[in-house]
Amino acid sequence: MAIFIDSDTKLLVQGITGRDGSFHARQMMEYGTKLVGGVTPGKGGQTFEGPNGTSVPIFDTMAEAVAETGADATVIYVPPAFAADAIMEAADAGVPFIVAITEGIPVLDMARVWPFVQEKGARLLGPNCPGLLAPGKSKIGIMPGNIVKEGSIGVVSRSGTLTYEIVHQLTTNDIGQSTCVGIGGDPIIGTNFIDCLAAFQEDDETDAIVMVGEIGGTDEQDAAQYVRDHVTKAVVGFIAGQTAPPGRRMGHAGAIISGSAGTAEEKMEAFREAGIAVMRKPSDVVDLLRQSL
């Protein structure tokens, strides 16, 4: 089975009437995701027109939407200034799985949100992430559905576009994926590498794992230690930013080298010490996986 979501996951879209929310809601519906409703304050009672004559109701609040639809997941396409409140509203409404796509949420907001989400017992993916996709089952977020293939490789990444690149490499070489997860590149995120590694380790349909990290922080080193101690499946890793200069932010808010711990070389060395096969470039993934398996 996939991790975190499956073909029965019932999804709400917060911000469904906005430009991004409406576009990606239709994309998710076309993929086959069970989208059961949307939430936009002031638009309650209206309907959202999906592809092929389908439609779903729009609600004013998350509490109302969850009560009416029984949704067990939500995805957030809300502007940064309001996204923290949207996450907290979802957690307060009892949604167990929250995916925050929004980029640019202030770190101080997330410092307030993350403890609240944990207190409510919800799982948060993101923010500033592409979401996740279980090939042939469900898609939540912005990952393109046409590059995936059903299979047994779990993919977890801090980078959205690098996820797409590596998944494309796998699919074109007839290597399918069990679940592809983008955890996001902000300094404060919910679900992390270790959470995903643990889930993939427990998943009977995942035979090997691809982990894509980047410069900044020590999440990759922590994940490598977890792999060494707890993961028996083959793991292949890549670190983005191998030529990045220290002190300069590279794309993500969290992708900045501060001291030796955040460098690509330090992270790759931690991978090697944990028995993780290390890619020098994304196109190495196919050969390394085949060798590992």
Label for each model-derived stretch:
Residues M1-L293:
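Catalytic-core regions of core metabolic enzymes
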